[in-house]
Curated annotation (Swiss-Prot):
Region (Terminal protein domain (TP)): 1-177
UniProt EC number: 2.7.7.7, 2.7.7.49, 3.1.26.4
Gene: P
RnaseH domain (RH): region residues: 680-750
Reactions catalysed: DNA(n) + a 2'-deoxyribonucleoside 5'-triphosphate = DNA(n+1) + diphosphate; Endonucleolytic cleavage to 5'-phosphomonoester
UniProt entry tagged with the keyword 4Fe-4S: no
Region annotation Disordered: where it falls in the sequence: 186-229, 279-302
Keyword Nucleotidyltransferase: yes
PANTHER family from the UniProt entry: PEPTIDASE A2 DOMAIN-CONTAINING PROTEIN-RELATED (PTHR33064:SF29), POL PROTEIN (PTHR33064)
Free-text domain note: Terminal protein domain (TP) is hepadnavirus-specific. Spacer domain is highly variable and separates the TP and RT domains. Polymerase/reverse-transcriptase domain (RT) and ribonuclease H domain (RH) are similar to retrovirus reverse transcriptase/RNase H. The polymerase/reverse transcriptase (RT) and ribonuclease H (RH) domains are structured in five subdomains: finger, palm, thumb, connection and RNase H. Within the palm subdomain, the 'primer grip' region is thought to be involved in the positioning of the primer terminus for accommodating the incoming nucleotide. The RH domain stabilizes the association of RT with primer-template.
Name assigned to this protein: Protein P
Annotated region described as Polymerase/reverse transcriptase domain (RT), given as residue ranges: 336-679
Length: 750
């Protein structure tokens, strides 16, 4: 007998008119049930020709693109000088005693973090800064460059100096100093690594390159650096086959040379390539000339001595003849000293071979929907999550609602800590740098996009004409406004640059995993140090709980001092005291249980207010509606099953038409939300088990068994056995050996 909606409803409400459960419940396994219930609910025929609705309230669906809003007054970010202490394990052991194996393993994962993708695709520098705001190209370019420069100054990025060297600011780690060690003997190295392959050759195997961070960088291969200057070696012709390791004598003279060429006043416009910190840098063929094409002749294979030297693009405007009212020399003449063409880092290290390319584009967006005054950098390293070579990121546990409630539902007083720039605490090994490159090709290449009459630089036609091609009202006005903000840095930011990540970036799937491991290990240490309190974390959200407010304040002081001693930066302005109701992960958790936060309840009410009936809604919009309603489903009487018709339409990528009955049913469900209570520990006395053809129960000394009319999928059979046990015994705790039943997420079975 088919199961009608009325019978289905009676069954849900355990009505007296319903037949015995053993006969009624197996009918729920009938595949046709959804269709019949849909018919009874007047959901109507889904295959109708009415055009689909692609927007419901704030939810947008297919074929809709949100136009990003550029804010020319975004506040530039400021990052503290974050340096997580390398001896973090030792410091934790001083604080709490010996660490557990689990804690040690997690902390070793991030000291340093390693990233070795199977395959890396390199993109041209023009794709470094994405043209995300076509109307504000120049403004966005400088804002992004400033953001990247700020990250480099804060020690988050390396700057590529040449194919095998990089500079950075901040305190070095030991694995970076190992690379930096210089003049001592090579006694640790095998002979295979001692003799370097010549400039321009690619004899090193792929394996050696990828393991450079672990193997060849551990010896004393890079040169020792004296007084922050990078010693300069004469460029070798590729056919000379001379190994890398030969140092010129007289490092003092070289240091002097470097510092001279670093000041880029117009009086000494000696610039050879994109990284003009050194006038004759090693391996130039792959480091610089690809960056500023107009500065070098086509025959770039010639030796350095033959190569003509051109002044820097920005300073060339100074004494040249004006071509119009918008000639850039009017801006360049505003300042006598435009500062250096490139800034130098405090430390230099040797890195694996890094091409003059990027592996991901960057752009700026609002920090979050509620904070449009500040900007956030978006880094697109999605190449590592796509295609045949995609990296399968490690999975990690996310606490579910019930376990959160069991753990945090108590009479404790709560506060939450905010870790500032949490991702940028965790250091990356330099061997990962060639895979995580961002940067830009310089302003001159960007200008080419702006003016339609500009040509890509042709050296036969002289440089001056090309300069005039750059002049346009749009560029002139933009630079004049930006001059007020950035001053002399306009010159610095107009040069090309390539930067690699020194700390874990946000755009890689590995980063959330590493951050979760790190904060959970730290909280584990804090819990053992203060056994009478509770510390819990999810990503960068750390909460502390204690019996009284006074107790909580002293705990807060002790934990803050401990975290600061490890080098973890907290944002004191964002520390929140919650009293006895903790706001965490979208829930409000108190001694009574958990409920969704008010802003989510408000969103649900708004969603129902704007939900149309008798109109086919695009499945993408349905997906967003289900995302919102699914979050609050555990707090409703019916739970997830109420959303099953929506799930089915999303899976089949069909439009869904809400009937007034179904909308009213959902409204009623979500109008009254019930708290999810903490599970009290108790004794289990009722057990259920099943096979595809039969079921069995044990209740104390009583046993029951039965068979199904037809063989069922095992998870369905186990679930039915658990339902029989609950209806027969009324017990709150059931024993089952099936993980699907235990998970209690019945929206889809394996």
């Amino acid at each position: 007998m088919p199961l009608s909606y009325q019978r289905f409803r009676r069954l849900l409400l355990l009505d007296d008119e319903a037949g015995p459960l053993e006969e009624e419940l197996p009918r729920l396994a009938d595949e046709d049930l959804n269709r019949r219930v849909a018919e009874d609910l007047n959901l109507g025929n889904l295959n109708v020709s009415i055009p689909w609705t692609h927007k419901v309230g704030n939810f947008t669906g297919l074929y809709s693109s949100t136009v990003p809003v550029f804010n020319p007054h975004w506040k530039p970010p400021s990052f503290p000088n974050i340096h997580l202490h390398q001896d973090i394990i030792k410091k934790c052991e001083q604080f709490v005693g010996p660490l557990t194996v689990n804690e040690k393993r997690r902390l070793k994962l991030i000291m340093p973090a390693r990233f070795y993708p199977n395959f890396t695709k390199y993109l041209p520098l023009d794709k470094g800064i994405k043209p995300y705001y076509p109307e504000h190209l120049v403004n966005h370019y400088f804002q992004t460059r400033h953001y990247l420069h700020t990250l480099w100054k804060a020690g988050v990025l390396y700057k590529r100096v040449s194919t095998h060297s990089a500079s950075f600011c901040g305190s070095p780690y030991s694995w970076e100093q190992e690379l930096q060690h210089g003049a001592e003997s090579f006694h640790q190295q095998s002979s295979g690594i001692l003799s370097r392959p010549p400039v321009g050759s690619s004899l090193q195997s792929k394996h050696q390159q990828s393991r450079l961070g672990l193997q060849s960088q551990q010896g004393h291969l890079a040169r020792r650096q004296q007084g922050r200057s990078w010693s300069i070696r004469a460029r070798v012709h590729p056919t000379a086959r001379r190994p890398f390791g030969v140092e010129p004598s007289g490092s003092g003279h070289n240091a002097n040379l470097a510092s001279k060429s670093a000041s880029c006043l117009y009086q000494s416009p000696v610039r050879t390539a994109a990284y003009p910190a050194v006038s004759t840098s090693e391996n130039h063929s792959s480091s610089g000339h690809a960056l500023e094409l107009h500065n070098l002749p086509p025959n770039s294979a010639r030796s350095q001595s033959e190569r003509p030297v051109f002044p820097c693009w920005w300073l060339q405007f100074r004494d040249s003849k004006p071509c119009s009212d918008y000639y850039l020399s009017h801006i360049v003449n505003l300042l006598e000293d435009w500062g250096p063409c490139a800034e130098h880092g405090e430390h230099h290290i040797r890195i694996p071979r890094t091409p003059a390319r990027v592996t991901g584009g960057v752009f700026l967006v609002d920090k979050n929907p509620h904070n449009t005054a500040e900007s956030r950098l978006v880094v697109d390293f999605s190449q590592f999550s796509r295609g045949n070579y995609r990296v399968s990121w490690p999975k990690f546990a996310v606490p579910n609602l019930q376990s959160l409630t069991n753990l945090l539902s108590s009479n404790l007083s709560w506060l939450s800590l905010d870790v500032s720039a949490a991702f940028y605490h965790l250091p990356l090994h330099p061997a990962a740098m060639p895979h995580l490159l961002v940067g830009s090709s310089g302003l001159s290449r960007y200008v080419a996009r702006l003016s339609s009459n500009s040509r890509i630089i042709n050296h036969q036609h002289g440089i001056l004409q090309n300069l005039h091609d750059s002049c346009s009202r749009n560029l002139y006005v933009s630079l004049l406004l930006l001059y007020k903000t950035f001053g002399w840095k306009l010159h610095l930011y107009s040069h090309p640059i390539i930067l690699g990540f020194r700390k874990i970036p946000m755009g890689v799937g590995l980063s959330p995993f590493l951050l979760a491991q790190f904060t959970s290990a730290i909280c584990s240490v804090v819990r053992r140090a203060f056994p009478h309190c509770l510390a819990f974390s999810y990503m960068d959200d750390v909460v502390l709980g204690a019996k009284s407010v006074q107790h909580l304040e002293s705990l807060f002081t002790a934990v803050t001092n401990f975290l600061l001693s490890l080098g973890i930066h907290l944002n004191p302005n964002k520390t929140k005291r919650w009293g006895y109701s903790l706001n965490f992960m979208g829930y409000v958790i108190g001694c009574w249980g958990s409920l969704p936060q008010d802003h989510i309840i408000h969103k649900i009410k708004e969603c129902f207010r704007k939900l149309p009936v008798h109109r086919p809604i695009d499945w993408k919009v349905c997906q967003r509606i289900v995302g919102l309603l699914g979050f609050a489903a555990p707090f409703t009487q019916c739970g997830y099953p109420a959303l099953m018709p929506l799930y089915a339409c999303i899976q089949s990528k069909q439009a869904f038409t809400f009937s007034p009955t179904y909308k009213a049913f959902l409204c009623k469900q979500y109008l009254n939300l019930y708290p999810v209570a903490e599970q009290r520990p108790g004794l289990c006395q009722v057990f259920a088990d099943a096979t595809p053809t039969g079921w069995g129960l044990v209740m104390g000394h009583q046993r029951m068994r039965g068979t199904f009319l037809a063989p069922l999928p095992i998870h369905t059979a186990e679930l039915l056995a658990a339902c029989f046990a609950r209806s027969r015994s009324g017990a709150n705790i059931l024993g089952t050996d099936n993980s699907v039943v235990l998970s209690r997420k019945y929206t889809s079975f394996p």
